[in-house]
Amino acid sequence: GSLLLVLFLLSVICYAEIAAGPTKCQYGRPCDSDRDCCWEYRCLSSGEEYTCKQDPGP
């Protein structure tokens, strides 16, 4: 029974991490894609690395 409890707790923690993903992203955080950033930011290159930045627009 205790193994199931551990698995349950792990799945809850993992789900919480995924659910909290967009809220903990901040401006200038390193990213691999736009999904790593909040909706108002985009994953843009500043020369060396990609970071979450405001979309400069068209």
From Swiss-Prot:
The keyword Transcription does not apply. Its main location: secreted. Keywords: Calcium channel impairing toxin, Disulfide bond, Ion channel impairing toxin, Knottin, Neurotoxin, Ryanodine-sensitive calcium-release channel impairing toxin, Secreted, Signal, Toxin. It is found in: Secreted. Disulfide bonds join 25-38, 31-43, 37-52. The keyword Secreted applies. Residues 17-26 form a propeptide. GO terms for molecular function: calcium channel regulator activity; toxin activity. Expressed by the venom gland. Residues 1-16 form the signal peptide. GO terms for cellular component: extracellular region. The presence of a 'disulfide through disulfide knot' structurally defines this protein as a knottin. Belongs to the scorpion calcin-like family. KTX subfamily. May inhibit voltage-gated potassium channels Kv1.1/KCNA1, hKv1.2/KCNA2, and Kv1.3/KCNA3. May also increase intracellular calcium release through the activation of nuclear inositol 1,4,5-trisphosphate receptors (ITPR) of cardiomyocytes, thereby causing an increase in the contraction frequency of these cells. This is Putative calcium channel toxin 196.
